[in-house]
């Protein structure tokens, strides 16, 4: 039987399994790419295919940066290579292990914090200059809580960079040959007919579509000012032939 009331633990286990299997968000940066990043040569992704424009970033040197649900050794090592003070907050042990592996290999310090972003963040008010949050809030039921916590822990003038799924992505089933609307929106994974935790993990965990009102409107409601936005496609799947599957936003406190 599934314990969907503890859905974030199911999703944490799913990410552990994805990381162990070498999933695309768990392929840690190699030494050459880290060395390039020390020279300012890098691409970082909030969404699958389109890199974040460099003019979205703050000056990294000595900046306090929070990688929110950003374990895996891909993005945060780049910030460290540019001499930022980096904290990674993630609920997956395996994703955090990849961060630890890269930091040990390259010889930099990083603060690794295991935690559930559906709860109150374990950080003081106005701690960080920037939050980097790649696609991940589809695994959290209350996304407006996440925006409120981001606003709280950012310093005044701080930057929130976030990637998230186009809600319409959840309208369709998994058929790769033909698109068919099968779910009403907003999609709520806790109402899935699947009752076995292992089966949920195989099917991508317990996910939530949210809405643009709670994604973008939720940032504004929390107090942010939206400064920039772009759309992105996925690198595979039938639906990406017809519409962008992801969005990324830059917002300012």
Regions found by a protein language model. Give the residues of each.
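Conserved alpha-helix/loop element of class I SAM-dependent methyltransferases that forms part
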Residues: 28-63
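Class I SAM-dependent methyltransferase SAM/SAH-binding core
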Residues: 58, 63-120
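A short acidic, Gly/Pro-enriched loop at the edge of an enzyme's catalytic core
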Residues: 118-131
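A short SAM/SAH-binding and catalytic strip from SAM-dependent methyltransferases
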Residues: 129-144
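A short glycine-rich, Lys/Arg-flanked "PGG" loop and its adjoining helix->strand segment in the class I
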Residues: 144-159
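Conserved class I S-adenosyl-L-methionine
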Residues: 159-193
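Short alpha-helix
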Residues: 206-229
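Core SAM-dependent methyltransferase catalytic element
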Residues: 222-224, 238-253
């Amino acid at each position: 039987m599934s314990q969907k009331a503890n859905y974030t633990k199911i999703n944490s286990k799913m990410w552990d399994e994805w990381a162990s299997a070498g999933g695309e968000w768990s392929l840690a940066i190699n030494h050459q790419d880290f060395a390039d990043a020390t020279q300012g040569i890098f691409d970082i992704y909030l969404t699958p295919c389109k890199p974040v424009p460099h003019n979205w970033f703050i000056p990294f040197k000595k900046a306090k940066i929070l990688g929110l649900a950003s374990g895996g050794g891909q993005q945060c090592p780049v910030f460290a290579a540019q001499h930022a003070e980096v904290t990674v907050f993630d609920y997956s042990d395996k994703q955090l292990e990849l961060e630890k592996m890269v930091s040990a290999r390259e010889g930099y310090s990083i603060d690794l914090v295991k935690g559930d972003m559906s709860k109150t963040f374990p950080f003081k008010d106005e701690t960080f200059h920037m939050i980097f949050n790649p696609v991940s809030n589809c695994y959290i039921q209350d996304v407006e809580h996440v925006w409120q916590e981001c606003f709280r822990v950012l310093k005044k003038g701080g930057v929130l960079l976030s990637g998230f799924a186009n809600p319409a992505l959840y309208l369709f089933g998994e058929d790769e040959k033909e698109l068919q609307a099968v779910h009403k929106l907003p999609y709520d994974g806790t109402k899935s007919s699947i009752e076995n935790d292992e089966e949920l993990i195989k099917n991508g965990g317990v996910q939530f579509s949210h809405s643009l009102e709670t994604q973008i409107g939720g940032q504004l409601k929390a107090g942010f000012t939206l400064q920039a936005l772009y759309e992105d496609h996925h690198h595979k799947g039938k639906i990406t032939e017809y519409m962008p599957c992801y969005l990324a936003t830059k917002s300012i406190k």
